[in-house]
């Protein structure tokens, strides 16, 4: 069954690839309906089902302005990595192995959704990141197998409450520091066929660039971190891997607008609100 799913998803992506070799997939709401689609300019070609399960164009076309884009996938697992750019380490030595952690699936939100600050939070930061979307079941994968198992990539924001992460009020695990509701913005599209090893990542806060670095400067590249994870946790189609944030980060406040802009993918935009 898994093999059929992988083959179907791959064939759909290949069929929908544009002249530049890329395909952009979305999940969207139109009225009360939620559906999957392929984005082509300002139009969304509706699919018969989930693009990860081989959904194909069903003949219905929507104008992009007439639909609400949602988080493009609903992952069964969210894996993330800490300290994966030297620019984010400060004076700390680079890790000897990928330092992975979980984010709960309830933290996922989509483009233009609000990042809602918990009432007792005091120091919530943005973390713009490239996110890999898994396309096939991976267990004990080699780096080459892990690379082949990536369906596509999207933008993510690993929103983090620093006091709960490492301050006086820190928890044993980062369940609320990085997993509170809306702390996992994702989207706006999943792009296939893109060389994600050297993409420029920029984060803007209220229009000002606050993070800017190429994914070529990851300490552990995407296949390496996925292969490492698969030694211990089986990855399934639709799971996502946040690949780390560069540089320094700052506190967000209600009313702020944060944008994660990755070359070849697009812009993930969210407004910050209080609960």
Each language-model region and where it sits:
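Structural signature of FAD isoalloxazine-binding scaffolds in flavoprotein oxidoreductases
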Residues: 94-111, 126, 259-263
């Amino acid at each position: 069954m898994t093999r059929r799913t992988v083959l179907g998803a791959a064939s759909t992506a290949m069929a929908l690839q544009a002249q530049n070799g890329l395909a952009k997939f979305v999940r969207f709401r139109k009225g009360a309906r939620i559906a999957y689609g392929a984005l082509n300019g300002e139009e969304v070609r509706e699919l018969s089902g989930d693009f990860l399960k081989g959904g194909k164009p069903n003949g219905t076309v929507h104008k992009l302005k007439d639909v609400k884009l949602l988080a493009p996938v609903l992952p069964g697992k969210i894996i993330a990595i800490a300290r994966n750019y030297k620019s984010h380490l400060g004076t700390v030595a680079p890790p000897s192995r990928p330092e992975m952690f979980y984010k709960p699936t309830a933290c996922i939100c989509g483009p233009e959704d609000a990042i809602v600050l918990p009432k007792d939070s005091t120091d919530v930061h943005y973390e713009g990141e490239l996110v890999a979307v898994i396309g096939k079941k991976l267990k004990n994968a080699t780096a080459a197998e892990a690379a082949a198992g990536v369906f596509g990539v999207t933008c993510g924001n690993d929103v983090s409450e620093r006091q709960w992460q490492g301050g006086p009020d820190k928890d044993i695990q980062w369940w609320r520091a990085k997993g509170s509701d809306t702390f996992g913005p994702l989207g706006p599209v999943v792009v296939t066929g893109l060389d994600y090893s050297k993409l420029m990542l920029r984060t803007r806060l209220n229009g000002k660039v606050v993070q800017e670095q190429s994914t070529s400067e990851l300490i552990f590249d995407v296949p390496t971190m996925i292969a490492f994870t698969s030694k211990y946790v089986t990855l399934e189609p639709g799971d996502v891997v946040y690949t780390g944030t560069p540089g320094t980060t700052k506190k967000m406040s209600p009313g702020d607008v944060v944008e994660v802009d990755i070359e070849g993918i697009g812009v993930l935009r969210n407004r910050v609100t209080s609960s």
